[in-house]
Amino acid sequence: MDAQQLIETWQLNNRINLYLLDAVSEEHLADALLSKGRNVGEQFAHIHNVRLMWLKAAMPEALRGFSKIEKSGIGKPLLRDSLTNSAAAIEQLLAFAVGNGGRVKNFKPHVTAFVGYLTAQEAHHRSQIIIAVKQSGHALDKKVLYGIWEWGSR
């Protein structure tokens, strides 16, 4: 396993999240799926909050200075800072896991699967965000919709 490639994959995933966040206007953070559930801002917050949940379970010392994003007062600056910082903390967890037998505490089977799990979870929420914006009548630019798949240029 190449530790650097694993960490770079995680970094790419987060850059895709930030790319999508940048494409959503502040007022569209309130857009929600027709089937209810979280709005766009809450979806981004959930991504951050799930990272914190895993840090608490696997590397609680990395949680210092972090707080969960609550439903009220969600704005793009808070989301950008939170996603950037929680991604860096997950990166620390990955580096630690790679250097300590490839295991993430409280997750099976190994660190590579953990990156796959987090990436899949976050990609699911990116799709929820895109659908919510579209269903609310605020289509994202096609460049962005294709751009989230261009990992080689992110």
Regions found by a protein language model. Give the residues of each.
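Helix-adjacent hinge/juxtasegments
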Residues: 56-96
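Short, contiguous alpha-helical
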Residues: 7-11, 15-21, 28-68, 105-154
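Acidic catalytic patch
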Residues: 92-108
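Basic/polar N-terminal segments that are highly enriched at the extreme N-terminus
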Residues: 1-4
